[in-house]
Amino acid sequence: MSNRPRGIALALALGAAGTSPAAQAPVAPRAAGAGIAIGRLAWADREIERAELPAKSSWRRLAAGDALRTGDTFRTGELATARLDLGWMTVTLGASTMLTVPASSVLSTVLEQGRAELAGPGRDIVKIRVGDGEVRGGGRLVLRRSVGRTSAAALEGAFRVRAAGRTVEIRAGQGTVVADGRPPEAPAPLPPSPGDLVPGRDPAYVRLGRPVELRWRATAPAHRVELLDLERDEVLLARETGGPPLRIEIPWPGTFRWRVSASDARGLESRPSATGLVCSVER
């Protein structure tokens, strides 16, 4: 799934062409603290790329198992899902998302655009900068970053959101919205979770490579559907949609769980629904 680095081959080709050192562009120095291994790419469905250090002028596609380093910037494709195991926390990236791990002795992350779900036990284990603000806490948090606005939804635990000199604490089941240049809004309840999933506890069977139709009771203008491992709460693929129904193709054989969450007009995301079951069979 990943492409091998091409820097050595490129250097040899330039040397063979007789390019003198004086004619070559200077190499940007590596930032202090960059390149330190901090985790691995635990899962990738579709495209996730990393900007290559030190100049970050080119991107390389990653594969599950690849090492992650301080100074890295990641971006996902339009339908991609990726899970980063950073040791101190797990970050699940949604589609069209960009995230950076700064080259710093203080481990943190920066969400530049898109959706990230961060999970880490303990107090203040999660540290992330987004827009003009910063979020700290422990538990499970969903952040959505769009132009000029950030939404934060606490699914578990508690988090402090700070921007424009003001700090707001959100606890499980609460969220806040931050407009760039302004303090966080007062904590508000998250939207209600969708319900009445079909298929539900009785699984639907679908042939591998054929789409399965998923339906639910909508509770907000936008929804996110996730396919999960049968035993673990690990998202394998996800799709953003308006309302039901949604037809998705499962590219692997096996039995999976699925669930759906809702997002209101401000971008606050609900807790996930209960799960339904889907079986993808080869024939």
Regions found by a protein language model. Name each.
Residues 24-202, 230:
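Flexible, surface-exposed loop/linker segments and immediately adjacent secondary-structure boundaries
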Residues 44, 217-222:
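Short proline/glycine-enriched turn/loop motifs at strand-loop junctions of beta-rich domains
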Residues 210-214:
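Structural beta-strand segments of beta-rich domains
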Residues 237-242:
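Short beta-strand segments within Ig-like beta-sandwich modules, predominantly Fibronectin type-III
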Residues 244-246:
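Short strand-edge motifs at loop-to-beta-strand transitions and within beta-strands
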Residues 248-255:
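Surface-exposed, short loops/turns at beta-strand junctions within beta-sandwich domains
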Residues 267-278:
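Extracellular fibronectin type III
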